[in-house]
Amino acid sequence: MFIRNCWYVAAWDTEIPAEGLFHRTLLNEPVLLYRDTQGRVVALENRCCHRSAPLHIGRQEGDCVRCLYHGLKFNPSGACVEIPGQEQIPPKTCIKSYPVVERNRLVWIWMGDPARANPDDIVDYFWHDSPEWRMKPGYIHYQANYKLIVDNLLDFTHLAWVHPTTLGTDSAASLKPVIERDTTGTGKLTITRWYLNDDMSNLHKGVAKFEGKADRWQIYQWSPPALLRMDTGSAPTGTGAPEGRRVPEAVQFRHTSIQTPETETTSHYWFCQARNFDLDDEALTEKIYQGVVVAFEEDRTMIEAHEKILSQVPDRPMVPIAADAGLNQGRWLLDRLLKAENGGTAP
């Protein structure tokens, strides 16, 4: 089961073409995505209500889409507007439509009760389209449940072991984070990690304009069910970074990691690593992107193998350790939200 009354990401804006049909499975539901004649994204059930033929192998006609099995035509609200050879259209001849919002270069979709869809609840990823930041968008498909990816993101002690040559340093294994949970009902977690007078990760070393020890930070906010935004960077040791000062030679990033369940055992993952320096250096943009891709492939190797083991021995217990503090809170919040949607007590 999935949490449904929340905003999920369906695609980067560039994944949905100006003309033509795009499709994805989200939360076990086949979804069709396309742009109308005004460029607005439309999200419909990717299934003709007549014989359940997939609409993505149909044809876009203006703002509508036509099934190319028997020719039924649907408008952006999901209503059938034409049945070839039949004048009367039964009221039940319709398909599901989904609320959708395009913001910060992401296409957001609401898979639950449409009446509860409030665009004001969408998490802000301003660095995606801000002129003061530069990034290259990325996407990974996972053969794993999305919660395993969330576990990974809420426990950065794994950086020392999974990413020793990319994102991690030895100190990541022992540093204890500060974990704060929002109590206003959002369920958001803020996790802060400071590495003072420490080595930089290789990813930071590759772009830094200073050498030697650094004060490094990872301040990440996670919003359920699977939206992570992070402020991370390195500054020369002793230059006031923990107090909020950012000297010109400091390297600063804003990171995005977003997951949407595809099925119970597969997931979509959107990411980027934005920077606020050397904005016109396209080679640097590609270098940072490729560095993150290498690191995330390290994650995927571990997480997909983890999924396979869990499917083989689903009833074997897992023994918690201190490093699980963040992911345990995340799991607890996800469980509460799911129960609330299904008649339990609201979080």
UniProtKB/Swiss-Prot annotation:
Disulfide partners = none
Q: Does the keyword Cytoplasm apply?
A: no
Could you say which cofactors this protein requires? [2Fe-2S] cluster
Entries under Pfam families matching the protein: Rieske, VanA_C
Q: Into which EC class is this enzyme placed? A: oxidoreductase
Q: Which UniProt keywords apply?
A: 2Fe-2S, Aromatic hydrocarbons catabolism, FAD, Flavoprotein, Iron, Iron-sulfur, Metal-binding, Monooxygenase, Oxidoreductase, Plasmid
Q: Where does [2Fe-2S] cluster bind?
A: 48, 50, 67, 70
Give start and end of each Rieske domain.
7-109
| BP terms from Gene Ontology | catabolic process
The superkingdom of the source organism is Bacteria
Catalysis: reaction(s): toluene-4-sulfonate + NADH + O2 + H(+) = 4-(hydroxymethyl)benzenesulfonate + NAD(+) + H2O
An example molecular function term from Gene Ontology annotations: 2 iron, 2 sulfur cluster binding
The enzyme's E.C. designation: 1.14.14.-
What does the record's cofactor remark say about binding? Binds 1 [2Fe-2S] cluster per subunit.
Oxidoreductase keyword on record: yes
What is annotated about its quaternary structure and interactions?
Answer: Homotetramer. Part of the p-toluenesulfonate methyl-monooxygenase complex TsaBM, comprising the reductase TsaB and the oxygenase TsaM.
Q: What job does this protein perform?
A: Involved in the toluene-4-sulfonate degradation pathway. Does not discriminate between the sulfonate and the carboxyl substituents and can also be involved in the p-toluenecarboxylate degradation pathway. Can use toluene-4-sulfonate, p-toluate, m-toluate and 4-ethylbenzoate as substrates, but not p-xylene, toluene and p-cresol. Also catalyzes the demethylation of 4-methoxybenzoate to 4-hydroxybenzoate.
Query: What's the name of the protein?
Result: Toluene-4-sulfonate monooxygenase system iron-sulfur subunit TsaM1
Name of the gene this protein is made from: tsaM1
